[in-house]
């Protein structure tokens, strides 16, 4: 049973997922700090010193912190946009690399075609003509 678990846990997909979760958590903390420590204070300044995190309304015993909710929405949009930019950049780099590889393959094919044409022409010159 231990060996089955070990082989399951060490499969490539599981390890990739674990690494992704750890990196995602760290990235989330960076973006949260960016939003809470830099962007939201600037937005508050633009809106006359308003601090979203402190916005709340109370109904009896219920304390509704809608400012925290607004901040969470801003976090979501910034994280989503950041991920979009990263994925778009990776896609562009991948397409550029593929285009370079295709151009290289086409060049190799052209060289091969040229060599084969030369070989054919040389063989024609050496072969007796059957006219």
UniProtKB/Swiss-Prot annotation:
Give the record's keywords alphabetically: Cell membrane, Ion channel, Ion transport, Membrane, Transmembrane, Transmembrane helix, Transport
Q: What is the membrane topology listed in the Swiss-Prot or TrEMBL record?
A: Multi-pass membrane protein
Matching entries from Pfam families are given as: MscL
Q: Could you tell me where this protein is found in the cell?
A: Cell membrane
Annotated disulfide bonds = none
Q: Which domain of life is it from?
A: Bacteria
Xref: PROSITE patterns: MSCL
Entry keyword Signal: no
- The regions listed as transmembrane in this protein's record are 14-34, 38-58, 67-87
**Quaternary structure per UniProt?**
Homopentamer.
Q: What is this protein's name?
A: Large-conductance mechanosensitive channel
Organism of this sequence = Bacillus velezensis (strain DSM 23117 / BGSC 10A6 / LMG 26770 / FZB42) (Bacillus amyloliquefaciens subsp. plantarum)
Q: What is the lineage of its organism?
A: Bacteria, Bacillati, Bacillota, Bacilli, Bacillales
């Amino acid at each position: 049973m231990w060996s089955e678990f070990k082989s399951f846990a060490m499969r490539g997909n599981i390890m990739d997922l674990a690494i992704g979760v750890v990196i995602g958590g760290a990235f989330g903390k960076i973006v949260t700090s960016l939003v809470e420590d830099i962007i939201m204070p600037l937005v508050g300044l633009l809106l006359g010193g308003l601090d979203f995190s402190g916005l709340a309304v109370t109904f009896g015993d219920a304390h509704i912190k809608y400012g925290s909710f607004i901040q969470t929405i801003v976090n979501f949009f910034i994280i989503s946009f950041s991920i979009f930019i990263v994925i778009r950049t990776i896609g562009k780099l991948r397409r550029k690399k593929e285009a370079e590889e295709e151009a290289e393959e086409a060049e190799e094919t052209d060289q091969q075609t040229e060599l084969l044409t030369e070989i054919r022409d040389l063989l024609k010159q050496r072969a007796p003509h059957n006219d």
